[in-house]
């Protein structure tokens, strides 16, 4: 069985999505499937026909980061980088809900993503900053 993770990385050269545990435990391979966070290592490719798949490559570019990526950079939300793409995708899905961004709600949203470097504080701060920017931006009205 081919996994979504394999097709993204090997066939489509979308290597931002990381392979971690291969068992759906670490979240390094988190992508959006019809707007919901899924672990690409657990999704058979045959189940994604007709769906919308979002990867970290779709958030922004090296020259033009999106607001969430910029907040991660500004707040030191990435260290070794292994968890960062999955964290960004989980955070993006959370922010898209419009739910109030509290420490607890952010931590719950990223609970499926493990980070061994940061202790999560900087990640939570980055997501909160991006949420506030979106809340006050003309592009993201209340």
Name each model-derived stretch.
Residues 1-142:
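Signature of N-terminal electron-transfer/Fe-S-associated modules in redox systems
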């Amino acid at each position: 069985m081919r996994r979504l993770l394999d097709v993204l990385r090997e066939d489509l050269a979308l290597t931002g999505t990381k392979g971690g545990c291969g068992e759906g435990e670490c979240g390094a391979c988190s992508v959006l499937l019809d707007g919901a966070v899924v672990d690409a290592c657990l999704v058979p490719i045959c189940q994604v026909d007709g769906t919308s798949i979002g990867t970290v490559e779709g958030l922004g570019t090296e020259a033009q980061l999106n607001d969430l990526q910029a907040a991660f950079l500004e707040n030191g939300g990435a260290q070794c980088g292994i968890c960062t793409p999955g964290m960004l995708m989980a955070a993006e899905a959370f922010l898209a809900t419009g739910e109030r961004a509290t420490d607890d709600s952010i931590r719950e949203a990223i609970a499926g993503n493990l980070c061994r470097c940061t202790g999560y504080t900087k990640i939570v701060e980055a997501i909160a900053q991006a949420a506030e920017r979106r809340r006050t931006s003309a592009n993201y009205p209340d």
